[in-house]
Amino acid sequence: MTSFFAEFVHTSDGVTCSDSGLMDLSTEEECSGAVNYAKTFNNNARYRWEVYGDMYPKGCFISESGNMYFNKYTGSARSSFSGISICWKGNT
């Protein structure tokens, strides 16, 4: 693992960064920059696009199929979408 990858960490399926005491990636650019890290646990990882809605996890997330998205929604509603969040390593 390179030092760049060491900056990222991912959650279990359905668990958000904040649930884990981790920091959300805050921009679409940060999320698309995490693709190589995501490929360490999902060979199909590829960044797709930005989304906005309370049905998705906040910040950067990856689906089981490998599609990665950045959710701009900042509200407090809980996600009903199953996905793995990609976070910055470190505490909030």
What are these regions (language model features)?
Residues M1-V9, R78-T92:
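Short, structured beta-strand segments at or near domain termini in extracellular proteins/domains
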Residues T2, T11, L25, I62-E64, ...:
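Intrinsically disordered, low-complexity segments enriched in Ser/Pro/Gly/Ala and basic residues
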Residues F4-W49:
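GGW-centered surface loops in extracellular recognition modules
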Residues S12, S26, M55-P57, S82:
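Disulfide-bonded cysteine motifs in exported proteins
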Residues D19, G33, I62-E64, K72, ...:
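Disulfide-rich extracellular modules and peptides
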Residues L22, E28-E30, Y73-W88:
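Long, compositionally biased alpha-helical segments
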Residues M23, Y37, G66-N67, N91:
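Secreted/processed peptides and extracellular or luminal domains of membrane proteins
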Residues W49-G75:
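Disulfide-stabilized extracellular beta-strand modules
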